[in-house]
Swiss-Prot record:
The RecF protein is involved in DNA metabolism; it is required for DNA replication and normal SOS inducibility. RecF binds preferentially to single-stranded, linear DNA. It also seems to bind ATP. This is DNA replication and repair protein RecF. Keywords: ATP-binding, Cytoplasm, DNA damage, DNA repair, DNA replication, DNA-binding, Nucleotide-binding, SOS response. It comes from the Bacteria.
Length: 380
């Protein structure tokens, strides 16, 4: 998998920028706030249709413009593809693949695969459960694009069910509304079933991907830590289940919904489901979130990212792109060397940095170095 060209039009701080990538490794060099990370964000959008920096398309578009665009040419084992994302404010984004307009995001996902690693990824360890769920979901979408649709279905059901629970709480405090309350309870049972069906699809897939990721991450972690640390990763589903069978998992959902029925009605919101899942990391039996040093946390995140690379490569049959956003400065020489050694000759890699002294001479000689200044890119 190789990104040959990238064109940014009214995207972030770029008015018009064409970039041709002629090496497997590209170093984007420049001071802060010049636009280095914006290039990586454009690639991330092509791979996942999401950004870890914002959820609003308006934020991607150059100030004063109403339309922005990212276009790219990708080379894969099965041939070359042209990708384009057109962003509008106001309006909805449009996607094209080989100049054909796509009606569904699902048809675009999987065209390009990429793993992003930035200093923000330390939130995987020390951040909220939401950060870990987003990480899992982003990985799953790349491994199995249909998962984006499955996740969307679940959150649609969740929103509808929450709206009904909110109404139920209000109805329960009003007199003379017993018939209305009865009708709402009947409706709630229908949404219970929908929540169990869609939620079981989400939790089963999350459990499977964690199961595949664990041994890969443990091997990398052991190598990087010099065999001094043992990493354990546990998926903590909000609804516990034993056998990976659709009906059994759905029954576990319905049982927990019944168990939490009163609490949900009092709170007016859904407290059962994968929107409350978490992942726990422990190092030598100690929770990494609370007690891990910054060095240990960085080792853990690096091991996870290397495991992601390997897993995507195993599943799709091609190495994904690797996006390293100002991360080398965050790593000590040992971790830097581990990372650079893995990359060498295998993954097309894009690295942002403010200086070049982290790289050895051989690395610099085999890399394309681009200078980024105020939304303009040119060779060094």
């Amino acid at each position: 998998m190789y990104l040959k060209t990238l064109h940014l039009s009214a995207f972030r701080n770029y008015r018009e920028q064409q970039i041709e990538f002629d090496h497997q490794k590209t170093i984007l060099l420049g001071n802060n706030a010049q636009g280095k990370s914006n290039v990586l964000e454009a690639v991330e959008l092509l791979a996942t249709l999401k950004s870890h920096r914002t959820n609003r398309d308006r934020d991607f578009i150059l100030e004063g413009e109403t339309i922005g665009q990212i276009t790219a040419k990708i080379e894969r084992n099965y041939g070359t593809s042209d990708l384009a994302i057109t962003l509008r404010s106001p309006g909805r984004r449009t996607l094209t693949l080989n100049h054909e307009h796509l009606r569904r995001h699902l048809e675009f996902l999987g065209s390009l695969n990429a793993v992003q690693f930035s200093s923000l990824d330390l939130d995987l360890v020390r951040g909220s459960p939401d950060a870990r769920r987003n990480w899992l979901d982003t990985l799953l979408v790349q491994l199995e694009p249909i998962y984006a649709h499955i996740l969307q279905q679940y959150y649609q059901v969740l929103r509808q069910r929450n709206a009904l629970l909110k109404d139920l709480r209000k109805t329960a405090t009003e007199e003379g509304k017993s018939d209305h309350l009865s009708a709402q309870m009947t409706q709630l049972h229908l949404w219970d079933q929908q929540l169990a069906e869609t939620g079981s699809r989400v939790t089963r897939r999350r459990a499977r991907v964690i199961e595949r990721l664990i041994p890969l991450a443990q091997i990398w972690h052991q190598n990087i830590s010099g065999g001094q640390e043992i990493l354990q990763i546990d998926y903590l589903p909000n609804v516990s289940w034993q056998e990976d069978e659709p009906l059994e998992v759905q029954q576990a959902f319905l049982a927990k919904i019944e168990q939490r029925r009163l609490a949900e009605q009092q709170l007016g919101t859904t407290v059962v489901g994968p929107h409350r899942d978490d992942v726990e990391f422990t190092i030598n039996g100690t929770p990494a979130k609370s007690y891990g040093s910054q060095g240990q946390q960085r080792t853990l995140v690096l091991a996870l990212k290397l495991a992601e690379l390997k897993l995507i490569e195993e599943v799709i049959g091609e190495p994904p792109l690797l996006l390293l956003d100002d991360v080398l400065a965050e790593l000590d020489p040992n971790r830097q060397n581990q990372l650079l050694e893995v990359i060498q000759g295998r993954f097309q890699t894009f690295i942002t940095t403010t200086y070049l002294h982290s790289f050895d001479a051989q690395w610099l000689q085999s890399s394309q170095i681009l200078k980024v200044e105020a939304g303009k890119i040119h060779p060094c």
